[in-house]
Amino acid sequence: MMLKSIRNRKWVLAGAAALLWLLICLLVTPVYTTVTLTYAEDPSGEVITTVFAGPGENVSASDAKSRVVNSGVARISWLDLKYGNHCSLKRIDPVYQAYSEGELTIDSLTVRKNGIVVISLKVEELKEYFSGNEQVSFSDTNTFTFSVTGEDPQLLPTAEFQNLYTQGNLPVFLLGWLVSGLLILLLALLVRWVLIQVRDGSWFVKITCLLFLAGVLGAVLMVVYTALRSPFWLNPDEYDVKAAVLYYFSHFMPPDIRSDIINDSYPVYGTSRHFEFNMFYFYAGKLGQFFSDAAVQIRLFSLIIFGMMAGLVIKNIRKNYALLFVFLLTPQVWYIFSYSTSDALDFFMGFLCLYELIEKDSMLNRVLRESFRRRHILYYALLSILFLHIFWAKATFYTVLMFLFFILLIRMLFQEKKERGPLFRKYLILAGITLGLFAIRYMITDFPYYGFDKLGVILDVTEQKAEYGYKPSTPAMEAAYSMRFFEKGISLGELLTQYDFHTNLFRTFAGFFGSYAFGEADWYYLVMGILYLVLLGRTIQRLWKQKKAIYRWEIAAVAFTCFIQYVLIVGNSWFVDFQPQGRYLLPILFFIAYLISRVDRVWEDKVLRTVLVCTCVLSLYCFWHVGIPNLVPDTVVLP
């Protein structure tokens, strides 16, 4: 009887909360608004369209919402609040600054609220609903055509448009109430679930876990916001990635890299993303082809796998606490998911490899621990595909395979002698299936084009496509500044001490954005460096005090793998191209997190928890303070 009473009370409280939220939404309705301007022709260059919309009566700088025009379409979205007869949309700047490439023509303007079209204006209606300031000169034609005569052209909504914009719409209201209510409910359930996971912990543990949850959710929100709004040209090599992704909109098989069909995918280096085995471009292309927004087309896949990674971290917030250290130690991890780069898929696969190692009941650990069962056939296949993606990744992620090899070897050597044989056979099966799948894929997708000489073809094509300073045949002294330092006579000591190698490497690991142009103040990197040293020192100290030989061997394996990671970066910068980029260091997060997972009762270690709290807060601050202001086009300057 008491249980029934409690259940009834819960339903009453839930109904009361829903009714209260309904009343609040009647006064102030959450509205996700999208304004779409379609130009008759794609404006020349990187043109930014800005909508000024906000709660105030007058226009302010904070009202700016901007997007780059892609393929003749500017699609600007923001979270709005509808109340009374207030019209939040105050003006539209069709271009960000002076435009001297001729007249511009807008064919249509559409306004969606919560996904529902509420305004759709064609050419003849646009003139009725919008006027221009003195820096917009309209033509006398029947089209909405105008010339830009100054640096601040503005389209101003008329009173008729404002009335149209503020009209009520029942479906918009209901969707705003329902979706926002569900999001609040989801957040409340997440908080409740986290508190249940740590119900036996101290107040410090409970508060920090809620902070970690906020950090993960905050990272997801900022990454999504940046991905949907940042221009392609602000991110490293994204136009080259875009060309490779768009190819797979209409193709399943990789192209012959000598084909003219992929000419647009070659940068000055003469290397195309189609040279790679990486499946990122295929996955992103096959998903993106169903969407019309240019940013969504090539970035949605990265956002999905980032969301999956965040979900796995939250789900394991206590059980596999070490996963938090991969996610919250540096905002550089978040950044590679906010634009389109194959590093995102490589990192995600490395993250799954770490999960397979530290999760007691993972596919890998069950296959290695249990006697053969039929479901293990599926496990072998999925694990081989996982490892295969690391084979297809950038060379800097090969250390993940090296790390897996060392850890599994150490585990085998610490088994009883009679257990080593069966375990070794399982290792061979996994390695054999992985290599077999690699060979099958090559024979299907590459052998018909190149035989066994793909590397030779790559070198020939690079020679043909690269600009002079980047051609392999160009004399070293005439090569581009960053190329072939070794051949230019620069010693290893000079490379490491006279070119800010370590400074750039660390800063771009701890948080640097754009084409490595936007960084924090010096104090940020100093504090992060100290926190990383404390983290490493505390982890090694705890493991060493546990006095288990296997842990000491694992520390040695991690140290050696990290050293190889460093050597790969140094070698590339010395022999190929000077690129001390922190994204090449990101795999060490997996190795450090593995060691943290081996610490006894790591959940209760206040030092490690405090360090993670600090890096979480600093990472959020860095991405919000430097990343977003420089990666979205509201404040950035055109190149």
Task: List where the protein language model places each region.
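Transmembrane-helix motifs of polytopic, lipid-linked glycan transferases
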Residues: L189, Q297-N320, L352, G537
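Start-transfer (signal-anchor) and selected internal transmembrane alpha helices
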Residues: M1-P30, N169-Y225, L413, F424-T434, ...
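Membrane-lumen/periplasm interface segments of specific transmembrane helices
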Residues: F406, I410, L423-L535, F623-P629
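Membrane-interface anchor segments at the N-terminal boundary of transmembrane helices
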Residues: T166-L178, F290-I304, G493-Y566
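Transmembrane-helix signature of polytopic, membrane-embedded enzymes
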Residues: C209-F212, V296, V313-W334
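Loop-to-helix entry region of an early transmembrane alpha helix in multi-pass inner-membrane enzymes
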Residues: G270-M308
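Perimembrane helix-loop-helix junctions
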Residues: E356-E370, V400-L435
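Transmembrane signal-anchor helices characteristic of membrane glycosylation enzymes that use polyprenol
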Residues: A17-P30, K206-E238, Y247-M253, A431-P448, ...
